[in-house]
Amino acid sequence: MYYAVDYYADMGQISQDCFAATQTGASDFDMDELDDLDQVTQVIGYHPQFHDHFLATQNFIMKGDGPLPNDYRYYLAIIAAARHQCPYLVKRYEKEFINQGGDSAWLGGLDFIPAKLRAIYDINKILAHRPWLLRKEHIERLTKGKNSWSLSEVVHAMVLLSHFHSLSSFVFSCGLTQKLDGLSSPKLKSPPAAVAALAPTILITPTSPTEPQKGKPVLAEISLNNANPDYDSQTAASSNGGAPPDSANAVADGPDATTLNGYLATAQQLPQQHGISVETLMERMKVLSQKQDECSEAELSSRFQKVEQQTAELAAVTPEAAVGVPTNLSHYVDDANFIYQDFARRGTESINTFRIQDYSWEDHGYSLVDGLYNDVGIFLDAKFRAAYNLTYCTMGGIKNVDTSKFRRAIWNYIQCIYGIRHDDYDYGEVNQLLVRPLKMFIKTACCFPERITTKDYDSVLVELQDSEKVHVNLMIMEARNQAELLYALREIMRYMT
């Protein structure tokens, strides 16, 4: 069996914590004021190795050869983003929809679109929140009758929907739902590489204070740091009776990264959580890498179920009931009460998991999607590889650190949230390497991204560099994207056979 651990080889360092920021209503955006190079692209530009693959994939599925007409493509982007109440993406693709010659009446909502397009909405809803509920019968209903879809069209639609569901997670996690006015962080930044290349006259470095300038990169305007500058890791530690974290125990992962106390602070901000130093984390990774004993299949299964059940018991960072869908997005949303429910339930004796050994991207999904939608598999595969392998091999100034164990724990934990088990993986490593607050943020970003607030970030992260936060959010986006596609493509395969 060809597992992901072999497929995505040479996996390296990734930041230990995640970033969250505030959300605002769709009315905050004037799309005419956005640069041609949109904010999402600029943020992803912190990581050029991934940036190129992301843009190539998005351009292909939106503008390249494919079975769906342009108006369908852009409308699918709108309704996918609306499931997560993401005004930034909805407003952006409403504008693109009109620019592509779309019927403005469709922007009145789901009651104003063709019956054929309306028919795929249930799949949009299921993929966004509970992809394990998708069945081959959903595919069959789409491909039969008066307004039927071809199988190639269904695949194209599923690729689009999963892309924009996952992109919504990224947008909220990176604070791109915020207005640009008055949100500059007190921490100085360097611009993403991709942005710097496009604007060579503008340079903002951590050591060269720069006054706000008209036309400077979006990341110099958007606050991607702790919204409460008076809160620091020392305060967090002392309030819990612990010693202030040593700045030498910082973790870094990015070309502009210097120090990072966030990993320590996340653990120390909860009294019941014991923080670990970077040295301890590195030692754990080393021990896990050297471990020779192999677990039985029964033990591996038991450890997966334990982590999955712990995930079900883990509240999102904002567990209270979700607010209603904003009125300026509600016309794109049907059955708003259909949201994520934990795949695993505490006390269940058997859990119907999605086993990668039975259906994997590498052995099954890639060839199926590429066969039904020419060349898209190549783009998706390159994007997944880039996200999984992205590395600067640094940790708190220490170079040439192999943290593949840590990154694999993050990727597999994200897919565990969706009931996917990598059969060859020891899920005991997840609890060794990922602290509880990090798990909480990952779960929220995947399942309830619209709930992420500055308060959540304040209580979890301290002094992270922009590139580090973006790095983790890329992992969340791509692992989720792949999880949705695995469920979708498996049901298409079942329908075809």
UniProtKB/Swiss-Prot annotation:
Keyword Cytoplasm: yes
GO molecular function: amino acid sensor activity; L-leucine binding; oxidoreductase activity, acting on peroxide as acceptor; peroxidase activity; protein-containing complex binding
Chief place of localization: nucleus
Pfam families registered for this protein in UniProt: PA26
Location of the protein in the cell: Nucleus; Cytoplasm
Keywords of the record: Cytoplasm, Nucleus, Phosphoprotein
GO annotation (BP), single: positive regulation of macroautophagy
Changes seen on gene knockout: Sesn-null flies do not exhibit developmental abnormalities. However, fat bodies from third-instar larvae contain more lipids and adults also contain more triglycerides. Flies heart function is compromised with arrhythmia and decreased heart rate. Skeletal muscle undergo accelerated age-related degeneration.
Induction: Up-regulated by reactive oxygen species/ROS generated, for instance, upon chronic TOR signaling activation.
Biased composition (Polar residues): 226-241
Residue numbers of Phosphoserine PTMs: S185, S190
Region (Disordered), start-end ranges: 226-255
The keyword Ribonucleoprotein is assigned to this record: no
Signal sequence region: none
Any one Gene Ontology cellular component term annotated for this protein: cytoplasm
Family statement: Belongs to the sestrin family.
Role, per record: Functions as a negative feedback regulator of mTOR function.
Subunit composition and interactions: Associates with the GATOR2 complex; the interaction is probably direct. Associates with the GATOR1 complex; the interaction is probably indirect and mediated by the GATOR2 complex.
Protein's name in the database: Sestrin homolog
Lineage, highest ranks first: Eukaryota, Metazoa, Ecdysozoa, Arthropoda, Hexapoda
